[in-house]
């Protein structure tokens, strides 16, 4: 079974608000992995619809975040994962003030119903269900400096993993259902005028592929991630600011690594980066992250207490 008693999930996401669970590893029963990830992202160019342009009014838009994350092994086949990021945004030019505060609390249940070894290869399937909700009363109608979109979400992801020796590939796809939000004005314009403070949020599909090297102490992988908004969104109008229900598509490439210390096998160091190569109504961001995670073995603690 591809589980690691002394290693931890690659919890650092391509999207800080949701993607903390998409690898082919399960936390062992009664093990709790927890830690923090610091992430820095910035961009000075963005896509207005499909037209790429410079961000002269705001200069460089940057986002710093510190996320607390955890993963508990209910069983070897069932994990519960959570994350809560604190985010700070800033623009190097213009008059818009940056924002800071808690973003969204996310909770994911990860289940592995199938795993089989055939010859030298191991095949496994996973199902993941996730929920997220705003953890503070931030404003969504303040893009691109808002902390998030403030929409409650529900997601379902199916994932398959193939490993032969220490080399692996993982592919997954998710549908993200987003709830409507309310904003602090009574009318707004998309493709037409809306006389309400309620904004209908479009759903999204996420497809993720990763390939790399996986051992008990080292994981290194290349990642391709595609986020596509479904029908209901619209493009940023010319020379205007973004709106929460814009179509927001992003194709990202990245690298993730995790190293488990030999002398402290419960402690792991993670790091990585990702870059937006194609997009629609999003910034062309470059993102770098690093973090530390530690595993507590509650089963071992209980056994020691019983002695």
Question: What does each model-found stretch correspond to?
Answer:
Residues 22-30, 77, 115-124, 166, ...:
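Short loop/turn motifs that connect adjacent beta-strands in outer-membrane beta-barrel proteins
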Residues 25, 37, 69-71, 110-112, ...:
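Transmembrane beta-barrel domains of outer membrane proteins
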Residues 30, 62-66, 100-105, 123, ...:
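Residues that define the transmembrane beta-barrel architecture of outer-membrane proteins
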Residues 34-36, 80-82, 107, 123-129, ...:
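Transmembrane beta-strands of outer-membrane beta-barrel proteins
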Residues 38-44, 84-90, 113, 131-137, ...:
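Transmembrane beta-strands of outer-membrane beta-barrel pores
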Residues 40-65, 144-146:
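Surface-exposed strand-loop-strand hairpins of Gram-negative outer-membrane beta-barrel proteins
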Residues 47-49, 54-56, 193-307:
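Outer membrane beta-barrel transmembrane domains
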Residues 95-199, 245:
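Outer-membrane pore/translocation modules
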């Amino acid at each position: 079974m591809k589980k690691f008693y002394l290693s931890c999930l690659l919890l650092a996401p391509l999207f800080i608000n949701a993607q903390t669970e998409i690898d082919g590893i399960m936390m062992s029963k009664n093990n709790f992995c927890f830690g923090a990830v610091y992430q820095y992202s910035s961009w000075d160019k963005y896509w207005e619809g499909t037209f790429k342009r410079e961000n002269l009014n705001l200069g460089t838009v940057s986002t710093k975040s510190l996320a607390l994350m955890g993963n508990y092994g209910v069983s070897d086949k069932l994990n519960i994962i959570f994350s809560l990021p604190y985010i700070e945004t800033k623009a190097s030019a213009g008059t818009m003030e940056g924002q800071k505060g808690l973003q969204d609390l996310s909770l994911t249940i990860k289940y592995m119903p199938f795993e089989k070894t055939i010859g030298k290869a191991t095949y496994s399937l996973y199902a993941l269900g996730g929920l997220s909700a705003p953890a503070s009363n931030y404003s969504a109608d303040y893009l691109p400096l808002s902390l998030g979109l403030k929409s409650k979400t529900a997601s379902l992801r199916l994932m398959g993993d193939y490993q032969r020796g220490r080399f692996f590939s993982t592919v997954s796809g998710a549908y993200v259902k987003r709830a409507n939000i309310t904003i602090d004005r009574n009318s707004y314009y998309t493709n037409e005028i809306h006389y309400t403070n309620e904004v209908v949020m479009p759903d999204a599909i996420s497809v993720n592929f990763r390939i790399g090297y996986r051992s008990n102490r080292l994981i290194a992988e290349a990642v391709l991630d595609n986020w596509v908004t479904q029908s209901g969104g619209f493009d940023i109008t010319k020379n205007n600011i973004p709106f929460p229900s814009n179509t927001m598509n992003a194709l990202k490439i990245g690298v993730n690594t995790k190293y488990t210390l030999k002398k402290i096998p419960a402690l792991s160091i993670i790091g990585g980066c990702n870059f937006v190569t194609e997009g629609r109504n999003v910034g062309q961001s470059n993102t770098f992250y690093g973090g530390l995670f530690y595993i507590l073995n509650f089963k071992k603690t209980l056994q020691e207490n019983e002695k």
